[in-house]
């Protein structure tokens, strides 16, 4: 199971509500297949975890 803290991601986006919107939008993009993940996918990482990791690594922004 992936353990991830969202505190770093919240600091990158601004607040928890915007983080939820940005991460959900990015997870949907990856799930539908329109956009590939920008980081290396681990074994059983779900799209929401991948989206949060991308936000933490500054690969995805609020805009």
Swiss-Prot record:
One of its GO terms (molecular function) is DNA binding. InterPro entries: DNA-dir_RNA_pol_omega, Pol_omega/Rpo6/RPB6, RPB6/omega-like_sf. Signal peptide: none annotated. One of its GO terms (biological process) is DNA-templated transcription. Its EC number is 2.7.7.6. It catalyses: RNA(n) + a ribonucleoside 5'-triphosphate = RNA(n+1) + diphosphate. Keywords: DNA-directed RNA polymerase, Nucleotidyltransferase, Transcription, Transferase. GO terms for cellular component: DNA-directed RNA polymerase complex. The keyword Transcription applies. Gene3D superfamilies: 3.90.940.10. SMART domains: RNA_pol_Rpb6 (SM01409). It comes from the Bacteria. Promotes RNA polymerase assembly. Latches the N- and C-terminal regions of the beta' subunit thereby facilitating its interaction with the beta and alpha subunits. NCBIfam families: rpoZ (TIGR00690). Belongs to the RNA polymerase subunit omega family. The RNAP catalytic core consists of 2 alpha, 1 beta, 1 beta' and 1 omega subunit. When a sigma factor is associated with the core the holoenzyme is formed, which can initiate transcription. HAMAP family: RNApol_bact_RpoZ (MF_00366). This is DNA-directed RNA polymerase subunit omega.
């Amino acid at each position: 199971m992936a353990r991830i803290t969202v505190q770093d991601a919240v600091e990158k986006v601004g607040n928890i509500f915007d983080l939820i919107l940005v991460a959900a939008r990015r997870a949907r993009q990856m799930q539908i297949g329109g956009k590939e993940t920008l980081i290396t996918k681990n074994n059983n990482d779900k799209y929401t975890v991948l989206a949060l990791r991308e936000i933490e690594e500054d690969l995805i922004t609020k805009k």
